Amino acid sequence: MIQEELIKFRALLETYGEGPFDIAGKMNLPIINALWRVTAGEDFEYNNPVLVDLLTRMTEWFKRVGRPEVIFLFAFPWIAKLWPSFLGRDEDIKINKDIMNMMRKSIKNHKETLDTNEPRDYIDKYLIEIQNTKDPNSSFYGEKGINNLAANLLDLFIAGSETTSTTLTWAILYMVRNPDVQDKVQKELDTVLGKYKIPSLSDKPSLPYTDVKY
């Protein structure tokens, strides 16, 4: 799956030619799509409205949580109740609800097409566990289970998308600023894998220089 995303992402980058462009805004596309494939079982093209909307909302969310006033609110959360609009709290809540609604819509679609004998992805497996849970105190029980599933999906995307894409963006910046290192990495890849093979985890022991630099 990761290799498939790499092929798609490389094709996207090739459309920009040899001129400069902002890669930071593009790096989230393969990450979010890979997460969506694991959790919801859908593989989107990068211009798909659902993927673009999810990426837009996630980007807005991360931009807002990095504001100085938000950091201030972590220390004094009660202030948000006094001036929610001024501090942007209302907009933060709206963006969060928009993302959660997307998650709930996917959960609803999965419930309507669920085959307990053929689970397709993370959501299906979670829904099956909810169906099988009879203990009211369990986190998988009934509507509480559905709410927890939606929250888990949100956590996966928040924790997994921006962190991974930012790490990769900085790795690319490091290569751009250090072309000698980039040349050595490329030479090792070409020597071990050849010009066309896509690397996998099984190749890691054979790529010590690349492993250290990344």
What is each of the regions a protein language model found here?
Residues M1, G17-F21, A40-P49, R89-D90:
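Short, polar/flexible loop-turn hinges at active-site or ligand-entry regions and domain interfaces
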Residues T163-V181, Q186-E188:
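Cytochrome P450 catalytic-core helices
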Residues M1, D22-I23, M27-A34, V50-A80:
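Cytochrome P450 substrate-recognition site 1
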Residues A34-E42, A159, V176:
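Extended, well-ordered alpha-helical segments in internal regulatory regions
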Residues M1-G17:
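Transmembrane helix-loop-helix
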Residues I2-L6, M27, I31-L35, L153, ...:
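Hydrophobic alpha-helical cores of multi-pass transmembrane domains in eukaryotic membrane proteins
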Residues E18, D22, I32, V70-I71, ...:
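Conserved cytochrome P450 catalytic core segment spanning the I/J/K helices
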Residues W78-E91:
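Short His/Asp/Glu-rich catalytic/ion-coordination signatures at enzyme active sites or charged loops
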